[in-house]
Swiss-Prot record:
Protein name: UPF0319 protein VP0761
Entry-linked PANTHER family: UPF0319 PROTEIN YCCT
Organism taxonomic ancestry: Bacteria, Pseudomonadati, Pseudomonadota, Gammaproteobacteria, Vibrionales
Keyword annotations of the record: Signal
Signal sequence coordinates: 1-20
Amino acid sequence: MKKTTTLLGICAILSAPAFAAQLTLQKELVPRVINGEFVYPEWISDNNSIELKDGENQLAVTVGQIVFEDGKRRKFDSQPLLLEFDAEKDAELSLTYKTFRTIEEAKAFELDPKVVLKDKNGKEVDFSMVQLRKGGLQGFRDYEREVADYNNAVNKQATKSSIAQSPAVTKTLKESFNELSREEQQEFMQWAMRNLK
């Protein structure tokens, strides 16, 4: 019996999953999309933290905070902020921002959003951030689609910039062709015609 208990204990320890990186968000920060996937409420723990994958992460968050406008309380919902950062295995990160009380402070945040990403030792972690601006009703937004559209637009820009660099390659190819002898040029042209798509 003692051996069985010991064996079960060892198996439990060995089969326990490795700890993943965790990100704890300030309570007013709402995670919307993590690494291209919609964040379901059950993914968020009681202390407003979510699990991250090791390595590169992309997170879309919004700020949902009560502010004062003309002496009345009102809910302010920000445009989504899309952050990209690296998380090491077992990292414990926190994401915060300076809370605001008035609608004027909220509008100032909207124009120039600032958030802070720190590790468990309080050291700031590098990240990049863009604000996804879209008009219309904020309550009916498809955050997952907006992030996908943004990522596609960024990929298209990268493709365009690589295409823009290709004239230099073409110029080099032309120069190399001109340096070939007449026979080598004819051989190259025959090869090119055979492989023409």
